[in-house]
C-alpha cells in the first residue's frame, strides 16, 4: 500500500471518528434509515421465502441500532431537539412499515395508537421541564410504573419490546401456532401501556402551567 493511500485512509478514519463523537446519534439514524430502505427494497423484490428472512434481519438490526442510538446519546450527552425528532420519526416509520407488511389485522389500530402516543411524547419532551417517564412513574398505575421501572430495564418492558418485534416477524415469515400466538400477550401489554401513556401525558400537558 502506498503512503498516499495510507494517508488517505487515516484521514477518512479520523473524519469518521470525529463525526461519530460529534454526531453519534445522527450517524446511527442514517444507518437505520439505510437498513429500512434496504428492507423495503428486498420486500418488494423478493422472489423466494428465504428473502423474507433478510427483511426480518435488516429490520431487526434497525431495532438493535435504536438501542445503540440511545446509549450513545446518553454516553456522549448529545441530545438535541433535532436528534429527538429524528429518532422519533425513524422509530415510528420502522414500526409502521414492519407492522403493515406483516399482514396482521391489528397493524393499523396499533400504529395509529403509537403515532398518537409518540407525538404527545415528542411534544412533551420538547416543551416540558420534566422527563415524560418521571410523570408516568409518579402518576401511573402499578402496571405502568412496573413497566417503566429501572429505565425500562425489567422483565415487563423486555416482554413488551421483544413481542412488538417478534409478532410481526412471525406473521411476516408465515409462522403459525405457538410461534405466533406466544407473542400476543406481550403486544397486548405494549398496547395497554402505550394507551395509558398517551392518556396520562395528554392530561399532564393540559393541566400544566404553560398550557
Describe the predicted segments one by one.
Residues 22-85, 98-115, 179-190:
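Membrane-embedded alpha-helical segments that form the functional core of polytopic membrane enzymes
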Residues 1-29, 88-211:
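A feature for the membrane-embedded catalytic helix bundles of lipid/isoprenoid biosynthetic enzymes
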